């Protein structure tokens, strides 16, 4: 804006003044140097004869003075000329550089969000897998026999202070990420190598388990014969197929649940027809065809298009800014480019003739033509439509002395609702129009606007101006706001009907003609003529401006039909800059060629919006489910910020590190209030009911620890050899770890340990396995005592399981010297579930075949009428001026 540029100029003036001062100082120094030489000569002992005429000296001083003054004046002239050139260059530079920087990275992130059904399931969901474990004799030596147990597939606990509860929360998160929308067993079935008649089993992991069991020497003959008989059973009349699978009972429950609660729905032509936005279906400019009959097995997954349950527009400034920015960039990419604009050179030549610039020396009118080019016009067209589609706030940049910019700004403020501009920018622009054009026309005094006044300059002017046409136009601009209309369940920001049909431009022209007829009594004649010529330039293009307004409205409304999230209007943190000279370019260069979005562009825009919206809702459901799970697992305080961060990361477009903490916690509070989706709740209940089974199958989670003051012997165990393990807690005093952590009362446990009574702390906790005999001798498990007796902490408790057998290092120390190893702790660990082939064989049922289509609009072939014949909502051509 104007006052900013003045500041910039003042800085350059100061810098140049400093340079001038430096130059003068250097000259003074040079003038002083002969004086110093003269004094040296006087003081020197050398004899020199000096003869100088006094008059000559005086004359030369005067000449020097006059030369100095002339050079000063010359420098002043040069300085002002240089300043003027800089100003002109700055203006030209400002007006020709486009304000928009395309951010391809955000656009790519948005377009890369694909519907989840694109991820094809190739395996069943599994937490467990059967593993062959050795058996150890009484003396710790390994036998040749093996035994099968169910163990965890991913048995990983991170290092450091870690609660087993976090393991279950991460497991739940992993299940949510892998939870399929549908399962088609036929697609994942593989051949059973051991089958007699080339039968198939449900997936590759089932086939691998069958192979391993078949090759195991200890497998019974009956089981081998059964594996040879395993194959699919097809019921073609019911479109159903049954596949044999080998699954842990918990895994079977998961997969059975996924099969029973698939999200696929039958797909037919009616659904595709209704999927296309209604306004595009009913738009006579678009010709849509569906020439494909879908098979009865066609399926689709309905996108989750619930409206924004978090209300991100309310009190989430930085998040809302990011969303609107990404929507703006996407919208700019789909707004069509203007075609057949008027030649810039020809238009400037015509404008010069209208202005009679050859006969004029007024510099202000040459500014009218500065910066007019077709790139700026196209940029302005895209910016206006994209900003309205994304509800991005705009700021106006202009020079007050360029009357043509201000007159173009009058068209802009007429067509675009006031809410779209940042308040300060709107006030500055309106004030410039009032004080440069409107008030001088009627001979009124300049408006002195108070900063912070609730009324805008136009609202004040409306009450003071007597002229009906001008006051009528001001009234329209003051009340020009979006109408909020719900269409197909989506809140749309709709333009006023007078703007849509272009009638408002006639209203603007009436006001402008009234202004040009006024006398401008307090201003010079040249000023009046400049304004009149500027108005003349715009009024000569009345027909084109009406067409431009209709074209702008049509493109905005057509693209708006493809938006699926409510268009909430809230001022954004950052703004999109709009140069008023680019608005002048648009007004003066718009041709009569109609441009409308191509059907392919519309479908692309619609698909990207649907995919983002659906992904947004799914991620909300995940976050709500994980917050509920964290609450149920007593991890609410510990995990909350990371849950919200993960939620934002999965939305793809956010730079999570830069989101302020207050918005993170506000987001957490909003997520807490939402109900959990039923599928996700059922999945958590499945995990919660079977936590003990999962703990038993892990090699890193124990069910408790026994602590004694005196050493306890390591016992013999078939699974491990010599081990400090307890399979039951008979005869031990038991204390619940949960209650101990909750109460913080360590007196009971400390007294028992000091009285030489062993105590069992019962509860899930992580442990470490060590098979080195040397470390068993070296360690006295001081870590366990220190945590409890001294530090009084059990949340970081991590006991060591000593496992000594023929696979261990230094096993000979035990075997050869009949040494009985001891430990002050015992790990309470229940035996994992043994693998039973018959109990693990399940038949899974699914549809024999169906095809899931993700891109429904691929079936629609679309074309447009000739753009010249395209009509607007009032059934009249968009562009009438031919």
Swiss-Prot record:
Question: What's the domain remark here?
Answer: The N-terminus binds RNA. It is necessary for encapsidation of VP1 and VP3. The N-termini of 10 VP2 molecules form a cylindrical hub underneath each 5-fold axis of the inner capsid.
In which domain of life is the source organism classified?
Viruses
Where would one find the signal peptide in this protein?
none
Chief location category: virion
One cellular component (GO) term of this entry: T=2 icosahedral viral capsid
- How is the protein altered post-translationally, as described in the entry? Sumoylated with SUMO1 and SUMO2. Sumoylation of viral proteins seems to have a positive role on viral replication.
Instruction: Identify the Pfam families for this entry.
Output: Rota_VP2 (PF05087)
- Gene Ontology terms for molecular function: RNA binding
Site positions (Interaction with the intermediate capsid protein VP6) are 222, 226, 230, 841, 843
Q: Where in the cell is it found?
A: Virion
Q: Does the keyword RNA-binding apply?
A: yes
Q: Where is this region: Hydrophobic?
A: 396-416, 424-444
Q: Where is this region: Disordered?
A: 1-47
**Record family assignment:** Belongs to the rotavirus VP2 family.
Biased composition (Basic and acidic residues) is annotated at 9-27
Q: Which stretches does UniProt call biased (Polar residues)? A: 28-39
Keywords for the protein's UniProt record, in alphabetical order: Capsid protein, Inner capsid protein, Repeat, RNA-binding, T=2 icosahedral capsid protein, Ubl conjugation, Virion
Complex formation: Homodecamer; each decamer is made up of two conformers of VP2, called VP2A and VP2B. Interacts with a VP1-VP3 complex. Interacts with the intermediate capsid protein VP6. Interacts with NSP5. Interacts (via N-terminus) with NSP2.
Query: Where do the record's region annotations for 5-fold hub lie?
Result: 1-82
> What role does it play?
Inner capsid protein that self-assembles to form an icosahedral capsid with a T=2 symmetry, which consists of 120 copies of VP2, with channels at each of its five-fold vertices. This capsid constitutes the innermost concentric layer of the viral mature particle. It encapsidates the polymerase VP1, the capping enzyme VP3 and the genomic dsRNA, thereby defining the core.
- Write the protein's name: Inner capsid protein VP2
